[in-house]
C-alpha cells in the first residue's frame, strides 16, 4: 500500500488510539507506528503476511490493551513482548508459532489469549503464571499431552479442540476457576480421561466429542452424576 494511505491511517490512530490495517498484504510490522507508542490502545494487523515483530519497537507500546495478528506468518515472538504490561487481549490465530518466549508469563494483565491454528507441540508452562487469564484458545495445534503444571492455570475457559492429545494429567481437576473444558477431536481413550474431572473439579461444561470412545460410555463413569449437577445448575443460572 502507498505511503500516503499509511500516513492517513497513522494520523487517524493518533486521534483514536486504534490502528487497524487488515487484508493489505503487509510483509512487515509498519515502522511508522513508532510515532504512536504512547498513543495506541489497539493494534489489529490481521490477514497480512507479517513474518516477525520488531523486538525494539513492539515492547514500547506500554499502553496497548489489544493486539491482533491473526492469519499472518509469524514463527516466533520476541522476548520484548513481555513489556506490554497493560495488554489484556492477544490474538495470534493461524500463524506458525512453535513455542512462546520464556518471558511470556510476565504479561500480567492478559485476560484473553487466542493461539488457535499454530504449531505448538506442548502446553507452554509460562501460561501458568498468568493470574488474570480468563479464556485461552489452543485449538488446532499439535499438543499431545497435558502436563501436571496445568493445575496452576487460572483460566475459566480452555479450548484444546483438534489437537493430538492422548494423555491428561489428573491435576487438571485442581484448576481453581476452570468451568469450560473443550477437548473435542483429540486422541483420547476413555481410560485416559481423569475421573476427577467429573467428580472433583469446578468444570460444568466438558466437551469431548470426536475422541476414541462413545459419549454414552462417559455417562457410565463414576462421578458423572456430580458433573451433571454442575452442568444443570449452570444452565439454570443462564436460562
UniProtKB/Swiss-Prot annotation:
The keyword Repeat applies. The keyword RNA-binding does not apply. It is a lipid-anchor. A lipid is attached at residue 2 (N-myristoyl glycine). LRR repeats lie at residues 39-60, 63-84, 86-107, 109-131, 132-153, 154-175, 177-197, 202-222. SMART domains: LRR_BAC, LRR_TYP. This is Leucine-rich repeat-containing protein 57. Keywords: Leucine-rich repeat, Lipoprotein, Membrane, Myristate, Repeat. PROSITE patterns: LRR. It comes from Homo sapiens. GO terms for cellular component: extracellular exosome; membrane. It is found in: Membrane. It comes from the Eukaryota. Its main location: membrane.
Amino acid at each position: 500500500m502507498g505511503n500516503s494511505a499509511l500516513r492517513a491511517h497513522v494520523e487517524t490512530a493518533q486521534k483514536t488510539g486504534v490502528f487497524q490495517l487488515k487484508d493489505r498484504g503487509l510483509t512487515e510490522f509498519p515502522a511508522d507506528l513508532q510515532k504512536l507508542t504512547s498513543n495506541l490502545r489497539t493494534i489489529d494487523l490481521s490477514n497480512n503476511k507479517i513474518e516477525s515483530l520488531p523486538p525494539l519497537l513492539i515492547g514500547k507500546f506500554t499502553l496497548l490493551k489489544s493486539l491482533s495478528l491473526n492469519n499472518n506468518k509469524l514463527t516466533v515472538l520476541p522476548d520484548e513482548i513481555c513489556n506490554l504490561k497493560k495488554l489484556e487481549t492477544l490474538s495470534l490465530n493461524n500463524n506458525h508459532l512453535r513455542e512462546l518466549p520464556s518471558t511470556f508469563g510476565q504479561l500480567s494483565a492478559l485476560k484473553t489469549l487466542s493461539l488457535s491454528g499454530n504449531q505448538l507441540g506442548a502446553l507452554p508452562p509460562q501460561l501458568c503464571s498468568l493470574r488474570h487469564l480468563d479464556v485461552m484458545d489452543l485449538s488446532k495445534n499439535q499438543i499431545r499431552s497435558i502436563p501436571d503444571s496445568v493445575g496452576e492455570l487460572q483460566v475459566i475457559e480452555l479450548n484444546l479442540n483438534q489437537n493430538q492429545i492422548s494423555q491428561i494429567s489428573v491435576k487438571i481437576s485442581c484448576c481453581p476457576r476452570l468451568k469450560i473444558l473443550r477437548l473435542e477431536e483429540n486422541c483420547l481413550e476413555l481410560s485416559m480421561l481423569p475421573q476427577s474431572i467429573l467428580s472433583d473439579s469446578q468444570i460444568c461444561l466438558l466437551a469431548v466429542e470426536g475422541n476414541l470412545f462413545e459419549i454414552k460410555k462417559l455417562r457410565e463413569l463414576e462421578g458423572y452424576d456430580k458433573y451433571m449437577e454442575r452442568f444443570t445448575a449452570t444452565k439454570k443460572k443462564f436460562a
